[in-house]
Amino acid sequence: MSSNSFLTPRIVEVHNISPLHAKVVMEPFEHGFGYTLGNALRRVLLSSIPGCAPTKVSISGVVHEYSTIDGLQEDVVDLILNLKGVVLKLHNNKTQSVLTLKKSSEGIVTAGDIEATHDVEIVNPDHVIAHITSGGKIEAQITVEKGRGYWPSANRSKEDKSSSSIGDILLDASFSPIRRVSYAVESARVEQRTDLDKLIIDIETNGSVDPEEAIRYAAKVLVEQFSFFADLESTPLPTEQPKAPVIDPILLRPVDDLELTVRSANCLKVENIFYIGDLIQRTEAELLRTPNLGRKSLNEIKEVLASRDLSLGMKLENWPPANLENYIKEPGHASS
């Protein structure tokens, strides 16, 4: 079956409404293809265009995100929200960089105050991060990374957690440089044919990517994904027997095996934390909200876990297992 009879669309016009906002006109499409391809492009633009975002911050004098900073109008939560609004670009194929923010003079702290390396470009230097009052100052280390989509801090890998130190705050990262996308389909004409489609994509970015470039990237993603179907052959799928999830035996041990102080152990049990697998999924901030569990107890827990190559904030896909009691009764899994 030949597809040569289909018309080939092209970008015929780009209306640059502002540096961040453009309307891209493409035609001609066969009747109905404007909606089909317009919806596909919109979904890829919103979900799959790569970008950069802050993923971790360490602020001098701050141990967790619920702190306040003397001499700063904003609390740490507001400061983090403002940091997420900084638009960056990483050059020379870099995927990560650590930036420094230092300011001790009274006034407004903007993205332009961040000391960027030659591989990092700050797109919106006038973006307000904080306000310093008399006698205040701010010192922070900001880790920025390249990625795509949305990356919740709770989904970070074990390596990210173990490499973090006290005072490091992991951020929920939204990498997408696309702020808004919509599309409209109008009638188009080629010679005597009047039943064709014209596709108009209205796209707004954060300034780190050109709107037309973003559309070309989205189209390339779709072409690569659909190319598989062009050579599609019928092949039987191998049948696999479902496997029981493998649970690390140490996660099935009771927290009593950690030999914590009585105060720390009692605090954990009040929070229904009975197994090591329960404990490692809690974050520092969650434990600090536990009644009677302070920074000293938290440090004790972290040190004991570190001695077993574990850390707080780890994500377990199959916890708790549906047959937890059976796991514990198996040979080698006994709690004591």
Curated annotation (Swiss-Prot):
Domain notes: The N-terminal domain is essential for RNAP assembly and basal transcription, whereas the C-terminal domain is involved in interaction with transcriptional regulators and with upstream promoter elements.
Record field: catalytic activity: RNA(n) + a ribonucleoside 5'-triphosphate = RNA(n+1) + diphosphate
Subunit structure: Homodimer. The RNAP catalytic core consists of 2 alpha, 1 beta, 1 beta' and 1 omega subunit. When a sigma factor is associated with the core the holoenzyme is formed, which can initiate transcription.
Gene that this sequence comes from: rpoA
Chain positions covered by the region annotation Alpha N-terminal domain (alpha-NTD): 1-233
Annotated GO MF terms: DNA binding; DNA-directed RNA polymerase activity; protein dimerization activity
The name this protein goes by in its record: DNA-directed RNA polymerase subunit alpha
Region Alpha C-terminal domain (alpha-CTD), residue ranges: 247-336
